[in-house]
Amino acid sequence: MKLKETLNLGKTAFPMRAGLPNKEPQWQKQWDEANIYAKRQELNANKPAFFLHDGPPYANGNIHVGHALNKISKDIIIRSKSMSGFRAPYIPGWDTHGLPIEQVLAKKGVKRKEIDLADYLDMCRQYALSQVDKQRQDFKRLGVSGDWENPYITLVPKYEAAQIRVFGAMADKGYIYHGAKPVYWSWSSESALAEAEIEYHDIDSTSLYYANRVKDGKDILDTDTYIVVWTTTPFTITASRGLTVGPDIDYVVVKPANDERKFLVAQALLSELAERFAWDNPQVLATHKGIELDRIVTIHPWDDNVEELVMNGDHVTLDSGTGIVHTAPGFGEDDYNVGVKYGLDVVVTVNERGIMMENAGPDFEGQFYDKVLPTVKEKLGDLLLASEVITHSYPFDWRTKKPIIWRAVPQWFASVSKFRQDILDEIDKVHFYPAWGKTRLYNMIRDRGDWVISRQRAWGVPLPIFYAEDGTAIMTKEVTDHIANLFEEHGSVIWWQREAKDLLPEGFTHPGSPNGEFTKENDIMDVWFDSGSSWNGVLNTREDLGYPADLYLEGSDQYRGWFNSSLITSVAVNGHAPYKSVLSQGFVLDGKGEKMSKSKGNIISPNDVAKQYGAEILRLWVASVDTDSDVRVSMEILGQVSETYRKIRNTLRFLIANTTDFNPYINKIAFEDLRSVDKYMLIKFNQLVSVINRAYSHYDFMTIYKAVVNFVTVDLSAFYLDFAKDVVYIEAADDLARRQMQTVFYEILVNITKLLTPILPHTSEEIWSYLEHEEEAFVQLAEMPEAQEFANQDEILDTWSAFMSLRDQAQKALEEARNAKIIGKSLEAHLTVYASEEVKTLLTALDSNIAQLLIVSQLTVTQEQAPKNALVFEDVAFSVEHARGHVCDRCRRIDETVKERPYHVTICNHCAAIVENHFPEAVRQGFESK
């Protein structure tokens, strides 16, 4: 027979090469056929519930890597909770209304105003559902488990009805009102926008310094005085109706030597402004507090028929400009607020498409608002003192990527101010990951204005508001409940298919309509009201869910989006937050830390990653990054993650291969009967179990990743498995030491597979298929291991921790010997340990084959004084010489007993004894020659 046939060389069909791109879809098909998600829910039916509510992605296009980060993170949490004693259903959702879908149809040549509205809305609906199907397949390809056949979709009639009921409850409490306040207006979308629908970019703008002449100085200023104003939006001068000063700011009247006019500016800015305007030796004639200037009257710079009132406002600062700002109540929130206080007219001179209207004056009418600068300069004439280009942050429509303006238009609002404190109180009760999220959301709610909820579009949920003949808005509970029931039965499209009187409850009357005539609102709801109602449309209506949710998890942009809108509607209707905890994640950037974009060519597609590396690599990447801040990804980074995956896989493959002849019901050794080193490894592993379980409960995936990688590479590969072959390969199959080590192998293999399942479900399932003694058909149906406590574990850990330090010192001695050409491999070494009493006691306490642990052929422990050439440490020294004897062909150790026998001359006595006791045919026939 061959010598290697006497070895227990681990064999397994578990492949080294994962082949993930091909294997993952096969596993996913098995899971679908076996209905694993439903079985897990059945197993946990009577367990405590955990509800992670899915924030709905927008149904348009394939998923991007940000979607992957989000959905994989949720999947890791749901899987870990499901395996840890919780009923944790996952209902994926989609946001399906809104402008992007209208834009897609427009690009396809669909002209909304030229076809029947019901037909147009059906086209929107069909497109949205096609995108839901596309994204559903993308998410399933990532291994995300959930009730994919029963998702929630915001265009479904039952969901739309739930949304109307939220609106109705808010209206019933007086939180819905109509007003003409300035709102973010997107001329490119022809619609109002919510705060969550804007993004900021740095742009260059031309700012102007100009002057208004005083008409009535109220005995404070002379009529030959000019008040100097600064603006960054020249087009709004067409609607300017006042000037605002700071009440506590000091202002000075100055007379430059080179100008006949007198000017008023902020005292603190005089020096800077004099230089900018080239004023020669400006003489200060008077000083006034802003409060003294209240209600002084000035003349509009080019329209003598328009008077502009000087007002006081706390929003005026000395950061830039002149300390005085012009005020156009139709084009700014601060302008509007101070204008209302002083009774100014709200004038809007720009239409919905950004075109200057007739009331802007004949010189401006028909021009695009952003192109009027030359006309403004011409109209200002010698009242224009200076202009300069500045770079500043400016709001853009997040969908069209075009700049927006503030514009006062009649809109429907949801009040926040009426119950703001209630919202803030609820935020204090929510747990945030990371903790700074609480402050961020708190400040956003504290500082935000009321919510403009109306949109001038078609594809969305109609505002269920009627108007009486006298213009009175009707949104009583009776009416909104009736509309909700109609929507639930027919869908919201019925709003457009029926006349107002046919939508109202039968026999409905109103004192404002003596003739029984009614009209209906044509605006739709902000899509953030759609998704912000999901706590009612999903959590509150599905039998398998509950409200409030345990967790909302989304990107950090959702503090002004879904976290925000959901909180407002939930507190408005029910008085409490829709979530107990909020977890936010940073954005996904490319490998250089730059934003991904098609133009840069740096987009990483999850589908491409799945094809090249497999979804497991993307999932492992998610676990490896700190999502509290922005994260980076590139194919190079994923390649590094793939290498880490390979190390984990091959380490676990070694454990599989070396437990194929191990039956835990027959061969398992009790803890108290294990060798000390085996006890140590089990204790170390259970520390890992504890760390991982705690990290899962805190959604701390990176800690899990680091802990697993460290255990696999340091504790297993670099130590325990490094000397394991000397036991599991060399000793007899049923040798006690081998069974002891296999006990540890198997315990680690089974439980680390369970621990990794939430992150690497495909790989874990593949490993599980080789564990024939485990009762669950799929590892996803197993339970997470719980950390065990062992007798004397602290003492064992202390002892082995001391040995690991000694081992590091010994390896330095072996490395020096290797560099000096005394040895090649460590098995060629005879290591002498010059031990102090403390070290000798330690080595005795280990009760182990120290030479085997250090992977040397021969070891001597002595308390003699170390020679001069020894490597000396504080309480121990080492010397290394080449081992004496010959290499054993079987165990590869150098041993002086090799060649001592008349037969089996190439192996040592220890190996010979094993062969003679277990392979009698080798004794009779000898070994085949190499």
UniProtKB/Swiss-Prot annotation:
Domain of life from the UniProt record: Bacteria
PROSITE patterns: AA_TRNA_LIGASE_I
Catalytic activity: tRNA(Ile) + L-isoleucine + ATP = L-isoleucyl-tRNA(Ile) + AMP + diphosphate
Keywords (A to Z) from UniProt: Aminoacyl-tRNA synthetase, ATP-binding, Cytoplasm, Ligase, Metal-binding, Nucleotide-binding, Protein biosynthesis, Zinc
Residue ranges of the motif 'HIGH' region: 57-67
EC number assigned by the record: 6.1.1.5
Protein name as annotated: Isoleucine--tRNA ligase
